[in-house]
Amino acid sequence: MSIERSVRRAVLGDESILREVRLQALSDAPDAFGSTYEREIARTTQDWQRWMSPGVAFILDEPAGARGMVAGLRDETDPSVVHLMAMWAHPKIRGSGGADELVVQVIAWARSEGAKVVRLKVIQGNDRARCFYERMGFRTTGQEEMRLRDGQIEVQMERSIEHAAGDARADESG
């Protein structure tokens, strides 16, 4: 039985969907993100529009509703770098390939923007996420940073992007 799902780029009008998925993510894994439930629930529609505007967001849709999201944002000082952020997949779809589809979309977007590297941060000790990103071709860089809001250590990971023609899955091994 195949899962009916699609990953699509978020557009104006998707603010309430992004908000709903982001709040689910923060309820499910409050320590995994740089923000808090309290901060995100207070965001207005205009805040969500601004959140989408400097980069890109993708939503994973299934018949049961939105089940995941991810965002990509160009680095402010280095145009060759795109940051993968706000990655989350609903617990019921983990291990089914949905998270892979979200990451592949950010990689494809980064490639189309001319980026050479996709970079992310993962909380130290979140081995499931780290292993997932390693499977997607990311490697730790040795850079670590203490998150100010709670003292958690964030480990930086990145992967280079091959600019050859073809789909983003072709270079998943890094």
Locate the predicted segments by residue.
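Acetyl-CoA-dependent GNAT
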Residues: 9-92, 103-105, 109, 144-146, ...
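Short polybasic/polar patches that bind polyanions
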Residues: 94, 111, 134
